[in-house]
């Protein structure tokens, strides 16, 4: 069983995903996006966000934060994530991995780093991508191609984090970074598995536009 883990010594994020591939998967509304979908395509509900400004409000048991979606850099990733938000996929899930000074990680319906939505998409990030504090990105298995994503995401909680440009960029935190930082303290620094010291629930995610 593959798990989505952020291994500190190797700086690797893992998450289970896989399946057949299909090109020309349009988002809802007849978009012109050309997104490759692997896995169960019937579970994919990609929402074409176009060029407008869109963000996701994350309401947690420890407070709220908001991040803008990187629609230009990652059109397929953001379209997939928006579709998951729209159907309430994340509501009630937890931040199952918290590594102080590194990341908080959530979006796994299994709650142990092995789950996902049943499909994945790909947006290979730019070669000069830097995973700075407040950046939100998607996790993948060590063997998946760069930019592969399902539903598991992470938020970088500290500057100076060194990761290769392999993880699809989802967006940047614009509000509530203090909440992210507080959540980021609820882990054991000596535990690379990132087992939280306190349960943190994603009560609800909401897609916002404009």
Task: Give a label for each model feature.
Residues 4-210:
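Cyclophilin-like peptidyl-prolyl cis-trans isomerases
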